[in-house]
């Protein structure tokens, strides 16, 4: 009974979960890949099996019936695997332990909207689920000969208590425990995890649950090798001593995250009947505006990571793929103790605020901005503008931003961090025909892909138009005002068969892997104002983690040593 319930069953769960996650077809090589990950990484497999065994013990004692315990674990595992398939197919990344923080009304509503992109892959997921259910039924039916019960009351109390204590220890993510598990079970270093190019690589190489746990371990901050506080302070002191004098005057500052703003005209195979960014192309010729390529951390989603980098100057390249600063870094202990543009502008007497059509619970947004110290936050339920297509229009958002700027004056400045949503995925059947200004002149793609390309292009056209409308409006302000607009990431444009003609475009698939990676993580950034900006730096590109610091250090403001160092 003990062998079946506490050894065989947990190992089956780990095995079947990895198989479920890896299957892209029927049978064949995938089956052996699962065995390969088990035998080449046996200790992680054994470690996760022990954790599931402890959970089985706890539930068995709770129900006093191992059959019920196994049913609960089978059902929970199936739900996890099913949702993982959905998330991976829609967003391109697997489920993580931190996704518990994603389960809130605003994020669930956004994912519900995205289900219009669900396609034929869901059939494969359903078939896998049915096979899983059949195997689960067989296990439960055979369990009548191996049902484990604890008739002794002391055992029913002591066993789950001890099991729970042991189970909790690996999930405290204490630094010493992390290092022990990494070194002795996974036999990996922090740098090896950081070298992983994609989060699903961990899941594939280590196994499903094994990779999920390793991903969580890798997200923990650790001091770099040979770290020295003295050396770090010397570097900061050098940056401060050599910091440049400001060349821009004190002004209102608007930093706008423009959803998926990049230049789709760089891609081959499709042509449009007009220039998609006529105003920004015009700005490029002006000597008082900055138009540059922006290197961003995410691809296809997780906009808040670009927002995080711009606001904090922290590069997420020091953390493994999949880390989300808003959901994993901020806590009550950091209130008043964090570095951000919000804090910098607060220290310079600005009113600071965040404005977006998204919801306040999305990625814990309202909580995070309270930790950052924003004076005011405005979310979608407070905005009165119109949607265009599925989401709140960029034109309406620009009007909302200008309404906030109208009340400013010299000595009464505002810093506004804003985020748009109109050009968020899904792109299929997003607009009514009457919503389009952009038409496709020629295309090599099928109807579905062409429809998505056109929807995305319309979003870029509208973002360019809305930015220019705001630019014209701020010319009427007496208060100096700077507007920074940046794209958060390239679009995630998946077809219903789970392929992406956008991602497979030759622009992203040259013979140079470095160029391919750079292009996948390149968007646009624009800086303009209602006064003449010194643009002598001639920026060709900038990383998102430097963008906020760059603007801050250009202005006539009191800047912390930290942000002087970031801009150095």
Features from the language model and the residues they span:
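Transmembrane and membrane-interface helices of multi-pass
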Residues: 1-198
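Solvent-exposed, charged interface segments at domain starts and junctions
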Residues: 1-9, 23, 108, 114-115, ...
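A diffuse structural propensity rather than consistent per-protein peaks
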Residues: 86-99, 119, 224-229, 340, ...
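Alpha-helix initiation and N-capping motif
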Residues: 100, 104, 205-206, 211, ...
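Membrane-proximal soluble helical/coiled-coil segments
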Residues: 111-112, 118-121, 125, 232-242, ...
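Conserved acidic functional residues
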Residues: 130, 229, 259
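Membrane-interface segments at or immediately adjacent to transmembrane helices
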Residues: 172-255
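Solvent-exposed soluble domains appended to multi-pass membrane proteins
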Residues: 237-248, 255-258, 263-568
